[in-house]
Regions:
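Conserved SAM/SAH-binding loop
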Residues: 37-39, 126, 167
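Rossmann-like dinucleotide-binding domain that binds NAD(P)(H)
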Residues: 131-175
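Short loop/edge segments at beta-strand edges and connector loops
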Residues: 36, 73, 100-102, 163-166
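A contiguous active-site-proximal alpha/beta segment in oxidoreductase catalytic domains
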Residues: 78-134
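N-terminal Rossmann-like dinucleotide-binding module
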Residues: 1-30, 151
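Conserved acidic residues
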Residues: 13, 46, 120
Length: 175
């Protein structure tokens, strides 16, 4: 919100958040309008950022695309490949932009190392504490997607082989 509010490229009209406490804080901190109704919000915008738990990405993005709004979705795009394909088809049908936020591409450490990187072999390990919200989607969609995106942007050839292992330890998805 801070960056959008400061940008000359966007007119930030407001936000919608179901968490009343957080919404009040955002409203006061940034002096922007809080919308309580998704239809009212949709009627006043031409693009939307969806920064919600992954499980709600599909329904929200579908709603806004059907309202002919451009959509930026925090990664991962959806919980399933089928839902992602449906959103892509909808965006194409209406000539809209649908963008997934792969923010690691803009990490200064990555952009600096990319200039000197010439990989022959790439291996990625993701280690971190186990967050409660980590149970809503698999680690592949939540974190490994960053590694895959970075690797795809670094290599200048087709991928020959991918090996991956995952197991359920705490949640219903590979953790």
């Amino acid at each position: 919100i801070k960056l959008l509010n400061a940008s000359k490229n966007f007119d930030l009209l407001g936000f919608l958040d179901n968490d009343d406490k957080r919404a009040i804080e955002i409203q006061q901190q940034y002096n922007i309008k809080r919308f309580d109704d998704i239809n009212e919000l949709s009627n006043q915008i031409n693009a939307v950022i969806i920064a919600t738990p992954t499980k709600s990405h599909y329904s929200l993005a579908k709603f806004f695309l059907q309202q002919k709004k451009h959509v930026f979705i925090e990664k991962p795009i959806t919980s399933t490949i089928q839902e992602a394909k449906e959103l892509t088809l909808l965006a194409n049908k209406f000539g809209l932009i649908g963008q997934v936020g792969h923010v690691e591409r803009f990490n200064s450490a990555y952009s600096n190392v990319k200039k000197i990187l010439n990989p022959m072999f790439i291996e990625a390990h993701r280690l971190s504490h186990y967050p409660e919200r980590g149970t809503d989607v698999s680690v592949v969609l939540d974190l490994m997607i960053h590694d895959i995106d970075i690797i795809l942007s670094v290599i200048d050839s087709p991928i020959k082989k991918v090996n991956a292992n995952g197991t359920k330890v705490i949640s219903d998805n590979p953790d």
